[in-house]
A protein has these predicted regions:
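"…together with the soluble PPM/PP2C metallo-phosphatase catalytic core" -> "…together
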Residues: 2-190, 197
C-alpha cells in the first residue's frame, strides 16, 4: 500500500498524509473518548492545585495510540521500529495508569519502569545500529557500555522531563507547534524569510 502511495504522491506526500491522518485521528478520538479519561484529583501541595481538580488527564493514551497506529501503517516494517513503538506505548501506559490510580504511584515505581524502558530502548538501538557515531565530518566508535549508559541517561531524563512538564498533555502542544513549523522548512528549498512572507 505504501509503495503505491509513494509512486503516486512521493515521499513528501506520504509524510504529509501520515501527519494529517495522525492529527485527524487524534482529534477525532480525543473528542469521542474525552469523558472516559481519568480526572485530576487536585494536587494537595501544588500552588493552586485545587484548580486542576476535575480536568481530564491521560490524553496521552489517545495521542500515543493514534501515533503508534499511523507509524505502523506508514513506516517500513522493521523489527526495530516495532520495538520502539511498543516501548512508546509502555511508557505512555505507565503514565496513564499512574493518572488513573486513586493514589498516585511513588517516584521509585515510576523511576524503575522508566529505567527499564530506557535500557530496552538502548539495547535495541545498539543491536540494530552498532556503536558508531557520525557527527559532521567526524566518525568514531564508543564502547558498548558507555554508549548504552549515555542512551539510558538521555531517555530516562527525557521521560522524567516530560513528567515534570505535566506529562504528554502539557508537552504535546509545544511539540505540535514545532512540528508544524518545521514541516514546511524541511520539505522546501525556501529560505525562512520567504516562508514568513507567504
Amino acid at each position: 500500500m505504501i509503495e503505491s502511495l509513494l509512486s503516486v504522491v512521493g515521499q513528501r506526500g506520504v509524510d504529509a498524509l501520515a501527519f494529517l491522518l495522525a492529527f485527524a485521528l487524534t482529534a477525532l478520538m480525543d473528542s469521542v473518548f474525552h469523558d472516559k479519561l481519568p480526572h485530576d484529583h487536585g494536587r494537595e501541595f501544588a500552588v493552586n492545585g485545587a484548580l486542576s481538580k476535575g480536568k481530564a488527564r491521560g490524553s496521552g493514551l489517545i495521542f500515543v495510540l493514534c501515533i503508534a497506529l499511523v507509524s505502523l501503517a506508514f513506516l517500513p516494517f522493521k523489527v526495530e521500529y516495532v520495538i520502539y513503538t511498543i516501548l512508546l506505548i509502555a511508557s505512555m501506559l505507565s503514565g496513564y495508569f499512574d493518572d488513573a490510580a486513586e493514589t498516585a504511584w511513588n517516584e521509585y515505581k515510576k523511576g524503575i519502569i522508566d529505567f527499564a524502558i530506557a535500557i530496552v530502548a538502548g539495547v535495541t538501538y545498539l543491536n540494530f545500529n552498532g556503536c558508531g557515531v557520525n557527527f559532521l565530518q567526524w566518525s568514531f566508535t564508543l564502547p558498548y557500555a558507555v554508549y548504552l549508559l549515555l542512551i539510558v541517561i538521555l531517555i530516562w531524563t527525557s521521560i522524567n522531563v516530560v513528567n515534570c512538564t505535566d506529562g504528554v498533555d502539557g508537552l504535546s502542544a509545544s511539540v505540535a507547534v514545532v512540528t508544524i513549523g518545521t514541516y514546511p522548512v524541511s520539505y522546501t528549498h525556501l529560505t525562512l524569510p520567504t516562508i514568513c512572507s507567504v
